[in-house]
A protein has these predicted regions:
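Short glycine-/polar-rich loops that comprise or flank the Walker A/P-loop
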Residues: 10-12, 47-50
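Short, surface-exposed, charged loop/turn segments at secondary-structure junctions
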Residues: 28-39, 64-73
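Amphipathic alpha-helical regulatory segments at dimerization interfaces
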Residues: 3-4, 42-46
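Generic structural hydrophobic/aromatic packing signal, biased to beta-strands
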Residues: 16, 43, 52-54
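Residues that flank catalytic or metal-binding motifs in active/ligand-binding sites
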Residues: 17, 39, 48
Length: 156
């Protein structure tokens, strides 16, 4: 069982891009040529953090940002963190253990500490219920009356 568990000692990263795509199937073989795939690999490498990053030229529809406020951070598919739109790596079932696991992996692999610290900062931001919406989008949604900002009331 240890060998199986050791195979899951990783963080996932990737990228969402758009571009031309072509494929050819020949029996059991598949040949793919894709601008989007090449761009995704380059973007993933350049960002260098454990996240699935959405390319800057992909416009995320407002409904995803609005959903963050309607259903909460665990239910929204996309987050904005440190100037990047990313696929939300968290859900209700695995949120808490994701932070614990990242901390364990960081202790086991200190040479990758910066990547784990990035992930743990994202984990903390979600736990603190930060907006995690691009500032310009948040301002526009508020100014258009789509969402309303209300200051947090002190607990009594």
């Amino acid at each position: 069982m240890r060998q199986l568990n050791d195979s899951f000692n990783m963080m996932i990263r990737g990228a969402v891009t758009k571009g031309r795509y072509w494929e050819l199937r020949q029996g059991a073989s598949l040949l793919i040529a894709s601008d989007a795939l090449v761009r995704a690999v380059k973007l993933e490498k350049s960002v260098g953090v454990p996240a699935v990053v959405v390319a800057d030229d992909i416009e995320v529809p407002d409904r995803y940002w609005i959903g963050r406020f309607a259903q909460g951070l665990m239910a929204t598919p996309v987050l904005h963190f440190r100037d990047r739109n990313i696929v939300n790596p968290f859900n209700v079932a695995w949120y808490r253990s994701a932070g614990t696991r990242a901390t364990q992996l960081m202790a086991a692999s200190p040479r990758h500490k910066d990547k784990y610290l990035w992930f743990l900062a994202l984990h903390q931001a979600v736990g603190e219920n930060r907006e995690l919406v691009p500032p310009a989008v948040l301002s526009r949604l508020i100014s258009e009356g789509i969402i309303k900002w209300t200051p947090q009331q002190p607990e009594s």
